[in-house]
Amino acid sequence: MKDELNKVVIYTDGACSGNPGPGGWGAILLFDKNERTICGNNPDTTNNRMELTAVIEALKFLKVAYNVDLYTDSIYVKDGITLWIEKWKINGWRTASKLPVKNLELWLELDSLASFHNVTWYWVKAHAGNLYNQKADILARSQISK
């Protein structure tokens, strides 16, 4: 069934002025022949929360299941969803240091959304010339002062 799903490529980014402070997020969704941008802000947040929010909002935008290639410049998001989350679940949402997982409500939402879609996760180096990562970065930063 997963092979029959439509495909979308998503680039996400989050930004924050101060940490914590006002923040913004942006996502570029590349469908077969269309490009869609979405963005938003939060007056009091952290960079990691904005990175997670960008991914969550991009996946929420998709109303049916998709094959998703998702690109993030956040190692926190990429490693969290691909390496850490299963261990967190086993450990009662505690880290390897036995501390509560930060941003738990966002991780729970992301886990649910990611399981609805068929997501392949990619890390892309920030500010390294990737066009769509740069577009997502510009979107995210543009939302900080709104």
Swiss-Prot record:
Record bears the keyword Magnesium: yes
Binding site for Mg(2+) 2: D13, D137
GO CC annotations, alphabetized: cytoplasm
Domain RNase H type-1: 4-145
Compartments, as annotated in UniProt: Cytoplasm
UniProt KW keywords: Cytoplasm, Endonuclease, Hydrolase, Magnesium, Metal-binding, Nuclease
Disulfide bonds: none
Domain of life: Bacteria
Cofactors named for this entry: Mg(2+)
Transmembrane segments: none
Binding-site list for Mg(2+) 1: D13, E51, D73
Enzyme Commission numbers on file: 3.1.26.4
Molecular function via GO: magnesium ion binding; nucleic acid binding; RNA-DNA hybrid ribonuclease activity
PANTHER family: RIBONUCLEASE H1
HAMAP family membership: RNase_H (MF_00042)
UniProt function note: Endonuclease that specifically degrades the RNA of RNA-DNA hybrids.
Subunit: Monomer.
Stated family: Belongs to the RNase H family.
Protein name, as recorded: Ribonuclease H
Protein source organism: Ehrlichia canis (strain Jake)
Lineage of the organism: Bacteria, Pseudomonadati, Pseudomonadota, Alphaproteobacteria, Rickettsiales
